[in-house]
Amino acid sequence: RQKEVKMILYIIRHGETQWNVEGRLQGQSDTQLDEKGIRLAKVTAEALKEVPFAFGITSPLSRAKVTAQIILGDRNVPLYEDERIQELSFGSWEGLGCRKENYQIPSEHFDYFYTDPLNFQPAEDGETIQQLCERTKEFYQELIHKEEYQDKTILIASHGCATRALLRNVYTDTSDFWHGSVPLNCAVNIVEVRDGKSRLLEEDKVYYGKEDCVNFYGADK
């Protein structure tokens, strides 16, 4: 009997950064993992140490790339960069506070980013959610139809908003963009792909305790 061929994708959000803690918009600004971010990535790496990754693909931004490097550890496998899975660009709003207590964004409707993301109006030099969905879809569809990847297990290191955009290729209800919230730092979504059909095996799984959770909206949400 022929072995069933399946591709397994581990789609992970990067570890914590100082801007995550401060509630500032990161977008495509190249922030670094903080100490806790490195620790969370190591905890996640330990949990995934038996996973037979053939290779990794990462956003070129350091916070995703270092997370991927930590998770791949001493596996001697390639790590490729792909700009299509970097975070949504917030343009001139990057670095600004986006929580109630530190709000600096020059728009009264930034809350659409959470409440109605597909109608979110970005800064003039920023990106819409639709644009993000288009580039991540192109990446995802190209990946899952590559003949030579059909039996591979692949690590994909990305970002909060970009991860949700990637998963629109998997979710049955694409009108619900956030599926609850921005994924936590180092949250892992595991997707199985057979014959170009995707199925979510694990959603937003974290391998660390509740005391380490920092939600995008602040620690108490």
Model-derived features: positions:
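Short, hydrophobic/glycine-enriched beta-strand segments
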Residues: 8-14, 156
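Acidic, low-complexity terminal tails and accessory targeting/binding regions
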Residues: 6, 88-102, 145, 149-152, ...
